[in-house]
């Protein structure tokens, strides 16, 4: 699943907004109502991802440490600022208007395309080949070692990359998958000895009610 809404436009993006906390708790409450249980949890090392798991656990009515928990940077998001700097090295104003917001994501789209095709290398980031390999390794490890239900709390880039691996999508399609993943949305995979299969993508069943319509966010 993707983390709840983070603090886009703030000095510190890597923390949940108030709505992000509510989205996460609501997902946990939804799963508790459905009797959903997990045998293991794998989370990236980013603060917003770990706060999302804390909110889910609260909604489930359990302690975050009550389940086997592993943290791995392989589930971390790419550095969007580093990606943008490969195509626009000059500082950008804060994306606090619709026009600047669109410009930010136009640049990000171009930078992602170049990174994924091996035409640009953002400073401080792995190559996209290595980024994708890290995600594949997490999925392969689950196949080998984790019977039962495993919850992965990650971000849009890794989730889109995982789906792209399964569907063998080209770079542009993977970017579109990335940009359309909503906060706290669930993507479900099944796994067998032969590998993984995509069951559902980007679902928000926990927000499928009139009182939660304004809880649906992309950033």
Task: Locate predicted features.
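Active-site metal-binding loops of divalent metal-dependent hydrolases
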Residues: 4, 156, 202-204
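Beta-strand elements within well-structured catalytic alpha/beta cores of enzymes
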Residues: 1-2, 42, 148-154
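Loop-to-helix element that buttresses phosphate recognition and phosphoryl-transfer chemistry
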Residues: 4-55, 127-132
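Short glycine/proline- and acidic residue-enriched helix-loop micro-motifs
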Residues: 93-130
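Conserved beta-strand termini and adjacent loop/short-helix elements that scaffold enzyme active sites
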Residues: 1, 72-74, 201
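Phosphate-coordination/substrate-recognition cap region in phosphate-metabolizing enzymes
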Residues: 28-107
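Glycine-rich phosphate-binding loop signature in dinucleotide/nucleotide-binding domains
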Residues: 34-37, 142-147
């Amino acid at each position: 699943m993707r983390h709840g809404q983070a603090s886009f436009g703030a000095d510190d993006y890597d923390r949940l907004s108030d709505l992000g906390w509510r989205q996460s708790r609501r997902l946990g409450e939804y799963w508790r109502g459905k009797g959903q249980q997990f045998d293991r949890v794998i989370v990236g090392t980013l603060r917003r991802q770990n706060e999302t798991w804390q909110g889910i656990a609260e909604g489930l009515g359990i302690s975050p440490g009550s389940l086997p928990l592993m943290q791995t940077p392989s589930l971390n998001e790419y550095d969007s600022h580093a990606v943008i700097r490969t195509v626009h090295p000059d500082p950008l104003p804060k994306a606090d208007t619709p026009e600047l917001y669109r410009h930010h994501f136009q640049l990000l789209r171009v930078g992602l395309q170049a990174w994924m095709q091996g035409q640009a290398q953002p400073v401080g980031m792995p190559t996209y080949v290595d980024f994708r390999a890290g995600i594949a390794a997490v999925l392969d490890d689950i196949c080998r070692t984790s019977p039962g239900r495993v919850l992965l709390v990650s971000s849009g880039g890794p989730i889109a990359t995982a789906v792209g691996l399964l569907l063998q999508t080209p770079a542009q399609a993977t970017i579109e998958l990335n940009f359309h993943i909503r906060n706290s949305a669930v993507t479900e995979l099944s796994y067998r000895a032969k590998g993984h299969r995509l069951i559902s993508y980007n679902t928000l069943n926990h927000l499928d009610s009139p009182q939660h319509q304004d809880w649906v966010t992309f950033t």
